[in-house]
Amino acid sequence: MLKVGLIGCGSITKQRHAYEYFHNDNVEIKGFFDLRQERAQALADEFGGKVYATVEDLINDPEIDAVSVCVANAYHAETTIKALNAGKHVLCEKPMATTYEECKAMVDAAVKNNKHLLIDQNQRLTPTHKYAKELIETGKYGKVISFQTTFGHGGPESWSADKSANTWFFKKDKAAFGSMADLGIHKLDLIRYLVGDDYKSVYSKQVVLDKKFPDGTPIEVDDNSAEVLQFKNGAFGTVTTSWTVYGEEVQVTTLFLEKGIMKLYADPEYSLIVVKDNGEADKYKLDVIQTNDDVQQASSGVIDEFVSAVLEDRNSILDASDIINSMKAVFACVESNNEKKEVVID
């Protein structure tokens, strides 16, 4: 049995972490902490456990084995490192942290304390993405030559706990990034996972097109971005993100391989389609991708993966020691946009 505490009680905790822990038979929820105590109390009332007065009280509770870190991006590293140093296993929300140095310090703290540190890169776990990875590794359709992927929705203000344009997601000191990292890390990590290689270079442009604070001033981070990337093995393609896709969420990935075109979540019935070089199509009906509209459903797989990795003391597909290499692309995107140039990734 894994005894867990949850730090930060916004929407991602309520709709995903707490809900999925609650439905895992190997978990006991010990309690919650949030700076707004009423949020913590509401989740304790719904899912069980108690409310902690401070984050230190929670991470120093000897009855807690592991924690979820679901605070604003700027506090991921500080909170995670405190928890690891207190002897807790940690599942941290994405993006991992706001600088490479923070990410490295998190990984180092996990190693020093011999604790598991996983990052919520849930797209690695969808049945379609996992099967796509398997197909690519078999070589049945050849290697990936190029790719296109996009992720867009109407913005975090409709999803966040405040339901307001005053959300921390729009503030640079709390979020550090905009759509490029909030959404882009999902796709930057996914493509790296599928291609099976590390990025070589990136050119990124990030803009504010539509989002405003309640007083009418533009938000402090991007609401749209476009990235052109190349892998060390030569694979080349684009990642685009948007918080201004109004109507329905859009997530589509296309991989152009030596022997066909692989389409992921492009068709409402078949989540994976490969149009082969002879024009015939292999179609696979696997799943429907989870969106922010799919609230309170125990289906992301992240919590189950975290719990089993800790209880079985095994490596995980979500280990921070690997995800940090995807974060290198995020930081290179920031540099590229700021310097208006292509950036080579070490």
Predicted regions and their residues:
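C-terminal helix-rich "cap/oligomerization" subdomain common to oxidoreductases
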Residues: 1, 6-7, 27, 66-69, ...
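Beta-loop-alpha module in the N-terminal Rossmann-like domain of NAD(P)-dependent dehydrogenases
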Residues: 49-109
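Hydrophobic residues in well-ordered beta-strands that form the structural core
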Residues: 53, 92, 117-119, 148, ...
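Rossmann-fold dehydrogenase core element
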Residues: 105-123, 142-146
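Predominantly a Rossmann-like dinucleotide-binding segment in NAD(P)-dependent oxidoreductases
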Residues: 123-217, 340
